[in-house]
Swiss-Prot record:
GO biological process, one term: nucleotide metabolic process
Keyword annotations: Cytoplasm, Isomerase, Manganese, Metal-binding
Catalytic reaction list: 2-deoxy-alpha-D-ribose 1-phosphate = 2-deoxy-D-ribose 5-phosphate; alpha-D-ribose 1-phosphate = D-ribose 5-phosphate
Job description of the protein: Isomerase that catalyzes the conversion of deoxy-ribose 1-phosphate (dRib-1-P) and ribose 1-phosphate (Rib-1-P) to deoxy-ribose 5-phosphate (dRib-5-P) and ribose 5-phosphate (Rib-5-P), respectively.
Protein's name according to its UniProt entry: Phosphopentomutase
EC number: 5.4.2.7
Location(s) in or outside the cell: Cytoplasm
Record text on cofactor binding: Binds 2 manganese ions.
Length: 404
């Protein structure tokens, strides 16, 4: 029976969507804008021969009605299209849950105040339950900036650094040695329980190391504590029917470990890619391998590093043929994204954009999937592939990728 591989190139948006005006994101285009910035800075065109052959660049051109400097080729061996998000937010859980067939049609809770962001009553509850005398931060911040600003005070006082953003998150940074990784995880678990009716999507543990503001750096031991999806995702449905669902990276955390049978953690593009290849080489028939390449978002999108983002895409492109070589005749590969995070855009937050929908198997020719009305088309296609009950949202494109 077939195996499927889903790889999420985290934050690779391909052009602002029609509702971007509601998010202040009209003009955002993660892919095109980073490619332009790369060309302007280096004088080089981004070199993506393998992703372009799959239709990634063509999908961006169709979604945004614009082009950009690149070296590549016309689509020749993959189905390509672009999908619009119908979920109310542009956050990680919303994007992933929607691509798994369950869009988020309710409003998340947010901490909207830029300073003194958390309710006093919540902070009091956290201090009482954890035994700490207070918190540092209590504001909107980027993860790197707040470590530079408060990392030393955290080491000296022992107080956790708590901060948020435009997303529905409560983030907690703590030093792995001075605070302790297990203590950080326990603290996050307590906060998750105390958030209660505030409807906050995720509590995120952000461990770091270093001995001064000059070298504080996050580690790969991040952990996300998500609420449950509002309905069974396609992962739940196929797992219940016997498909072996494998998470690589932070997928299991995003889905609150629901519908996941096996988990592999890894840090960095190459380690995540290697773990994915290992599973392709060893996974049984009737398996789904689901990988999130988080570094595109956290290392380059949020940090507004267009040049680094472009180089990382080139590094990914070099490795794409390894997927083809590892895949069996029955396997199908999907490449997509969960939202945008334009590294040329003001601020540090996600951007509301179309995402690519790319599909590949060994017998496929080039197929234009066009404009998909929801990320859930991917989940519906996976449901059909594994012959389980249809999802409530989305239109399968499975017949289109096997029609030629």
């Amino acid at each position: 029976m077939a195996r499927a591989i889903i790889i999420v190139i985290d934050s690779l948006g391909i052009g602002y969507s029609p509702d971007a005006v509601d998010f202040g994101d009209v003009g955002a285009n993660t892919f095109a804008n980073l490619a332009r910035a790369y060309y302007e800075e280096t004088g080089k065109e981004i070199f993506l021969p393998n992703l372009s052959a799959l239709g990634m660049i063509k999908a961006c051109e169709q979604a945004s009605n614009q082009t950009f400097p690149y070296q590549g080729q016309e689509p020749s061996k993959g189905a390509y299209g672009f999908a619009q998000e119908i979920s109310t937010g542009k956050d990680t859980p919303s994007g992933h849950w929607e691509m798994a067939g369950v869009p988020v049609l309710f409003d998340w809770g947010y901490f909207t105040d830029k300073n003194s962001s958390f309710p006093t009553s919540l902070i009091d509850d956290i201090n009482r339950e954890t035994g700490f005398d207070g918190i540092l931060g209590n504001c909107h911040a980027s993860g790197t900036e707040i470590l530079t600003r408060l990392g030393q005070e955290h080491i000296e006082t022992g107080l956790p650094i708590c901060y948020t953003s435009a997303d529905s998150v409560f983030q907690i940074a703590a030093h792995e040695e001075h605070f302790g990784l297990d203590n950080l995880y326990k603290y996050c678990e307590t906060v998750r329980e105390l958030l209660g009716d505030l409807n906050i999507g995720r509590v995120i543990a952000r461990p770091f190391v270093g001995d001064s503001a000059d070298n504080f750096a996050r580690t790969g031991n991040r952990r996300d504590y998500s609420v449950l999806p509002p309905a069974p995702t396609v992962l739940d449905k196929i797992s219940q029917e016997g498909t072996h669902v494998i998470s690589v990276g932070k997928i299991a955390d995003i889905f609150a470990h629901q519908g996941i049978d096996e988990k592999t953690k890894a840090t960095g593009l190459n380690a995540l890619f290697d773990a994915t290849l290992d599973h392709i080489n060893t996974a049984q028939d009737n398996s789904l391998i689901f990988t999130n390449l988080v570094n595109f978002d956290q290392d380059f999108g949020h940090r507004r590093d267009a040049i680094g983002y472009a180089k990382e895409l080139e590094a990914l492109d070099v490795r794409i043929p390894e997927l083809f070589h590892a895949m069996s005749a029955e396997d199908v590969l999907f490449l997509t994204a969960d939202h945008g995070c334009d590294p040329t855009w003001p601020g540090t937050e996600h951007t509301r954009e179309y995402v690519p929908i790319i599909a590949y198997h060994h017998q496929i020719d080039s197929v234009n999937l066009g404009n998909r009305k929801t990320f859930a088309d991917l989940g519906q296609s996976v449901a059909e592939l594994f012959n389980v009950e249809a999802m409530d949202y989305g239109t399968s494109f499975l017949s289109e990728i096997y029609s030629k």
